[in-house]
Curated annotation (Swiss-Prot):
This is Cobalt transport protein CbiN. One of its GO terms (cellular component) is plasma membrane. Its main location: membrane. It is found in: Cell membrane. Part of the energy-coupling factor (ECF) transporter complex CbiMNOQ involved in cobalt import. GO terms for molecular function: cobalt ion transmembrane transporter activity. Forms an energy-coupling factor (ECF) transporter complex composed of an ATP-binding protein (A component, CbiO), a transmembrane protein (T component, CbiQ) and 2 possible substrate-capture proteins (S components, CbiM and CbiN) of unknown stoichimetry. Keywords: Cell membrane, Cobalamin biosynthesis, Cobalt, Cobalt transport, Ion transport, Membrane, Transmembrane, Transmembrane helix, Transport. The chain crosses the membrane at residues 6-26, 68-88. The lineage of its organism: Archaea, Methanobacteriati, Methanobacteriota, Methanomada group, Methanococci. InterPro entries: CbiN. Pathway: Cofactor biosynthesis; adenosylcobalamin biosynthesis. Belongs to the CbiN family. It holds the Pfam family CbiN.
Length: 97
């Protein structure tokens, strides 16, 4: 195996392990990872306590796991579409040459 391949594999391993090593679990109780939606909702209620939303969602996932599944499915479908687009254009370019 060439040296540049070994370096690339080591780089990928470091990129995978670094966040796991750096994460200590601190801050979850303080809401550091609450997300933008929760922070925006809190800020709106602070600015205007009588604010009423214009509409409600017609369906809400029964659990956080299903919500995460739907988000991951949406990301996978988007990745497939983008991959198809790149593959189609690459094949079209190679066909010209």
């Amino acid at each position: 195996m060439e040296f540049k391949h070994v370096l690339m594999i080591l780089g990928v391993i470091i990129l995978i392990l670094a966040p796991l090593i750096m994460y200590s679990g601190l801050g979850e109780d303080e809401g550091y990872f609450g997300g933008a939606d929760g922070a925006a909702g809190d800020l709106i209620m602070e600015i205007s306590p009588n604010y009423e939303p214009w509409f409600e969602p017609f369906w809400e996932p029964p659990s956080g796991e299903i919500e995460s599944l739907l988000f991951a499915l949406q990301a996978a479908i988007g990745a497939i579409i983008i991959g198809y687009f790149f593959g189609y254009n690459k094949a079209k370019y190679e066909d010209k040459n």
